[in-house]
Amino acid sequence: MACLAMLAVAGPKLEMSWKNPGYSGGQFKKILVLALNGKAANRMEFEDQLVAAISRPTGKAYPSYEFIMRPDATPIDMKDMRELVKEQNFDAIVVARVTKHDTTTTYVPGQVYAPSPYYGTFYGYYNALYPVVYTPGYMQTERVGQVEVNLYSTAKPDGELVWTGITNTFEIGSVMKTIKSLVKVLTKQLEKDNIIPPQSK
């Protein structure tokens, strides 16, 4: 049960974050959120959740799929991207990509558990002696990925890297739950690093 509980709460963990010490452009007013790889449905879900999490009254975020529809494994035309950024006046772009995705399978051996004996009564003794619980071994599969998120200012023609965050992400039950946890971790760090203002309560 302990193993199952640990798996249930395991989730994305921030490995590192970096903020450009030379950046002094202030808060962003219009941010484009772009997920580079993965299935289209998962990209859209990630973009939607991150947009909702980082949008503020002082600056709003937008999912890229509202402007660029990409089937799976379709690259982005950089000329189109430049035109989009210029036409829509985006002052920042958040780019997320999965840099590593591994599936590991390990064997978790069974365990024998016996409650401490209680000899005061027959029923106590009997119930303590016989309910020896055996948990059979099982194969445990974990999907582990690394997600890199970069935020660029568009003030310069080729963009300027302002912030980077890298997470190790453990799939927790479903893709949707994993995305939700990932977005929460990223948003917390973006606030901590003063890239976006804290959410008003």
Predicted regions and their residues:
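C-terminal/domain-edge helix-coil "capping" segments
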Residues: 9-29, 130, 134-201
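Glycine-rich loops and low-complexity Gly/Arg-rich segments
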Residues: 56-60, 86-90, 118-123, 172-178, ...
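Short, low-complexity, polar/charged sequence segments that are solvent-exposed and flexible
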Residues: 50-55, 83, 113-116, 166-171, ...
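Surface-exposed short loop/turn segments
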Residues: 75-151
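Hydrophobic h-region of N-terminal signal peptides that target proteins for export
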Residues: 2-10
